[in-house]
């Protein structure tokens, strides 16, 4: 006996159900819309997949499956060098470039390279002069969204993300999440060599180097070694004189983000980045 096919939960069943409904109503499946697409094509295009946990909707089942990893906590992509794991391959590849120093995204104007396309797109605004973020209060325009957010606070005084434990405020939720570990005592990063635990992954990774090869990134100018490629990049500016962080209030440039952030706090009333 062949299994009963009620069509529930299958693509074929869903499509058959749609066909039956259209036959009963007399709809013409092969009638075209204004763009030349038949109705059966439109039915297939509009089929959606909904997450039962949060209600997010996707047009492909594969996207839903990938999204559900956020709720399940599954992180199948693990980088062996540091042990950090990611739910999606794109995040894994992005993290891997921190270790390898790979920067595949190149600016066609000045040949400067970046490890992320989003960083390149932001940087290109220096050449184009584009300032897409405009303050509705004073009319000032900004190239970067982060700088725009910092400026906006000077008008509104809004506290974007506040710690309920100590009242400290932050521009970004990720900064608040990182800060909260101070209060919870959470130390999710454990060294497999000696058993030590760490609150922050960056500190854990630096510690793990004491068991292995030390500092893999070396400055060609002075020979100083670093744990991370971005630390080497930051150090290199002391030789080149590059100052990529500009305060738009006073047109002052900085070689390090920490110095730029300190200057920004002066304008924003002391709020942390």
Curated annotation (Swiss-Prot):
Keywords: DNA-binding, Metal-binding, Nucleus, Repeat, Transcription, Transcription regulation, Zinc, Zinc-finger. A zinc finger (C2H2-type) spans 49-71, 77-99, 105-127, 133-155, 161-183, 187-211, 217-239. Pfam families: zf-C2H2. One of its GO terms (molecular function) is zinc ion binding. May be involved in transcriptional regulation. Belongs to the krueppel C2H2-type zinc-finger protein family. This is Zinc finger protein 80. The gene is ZNF80.
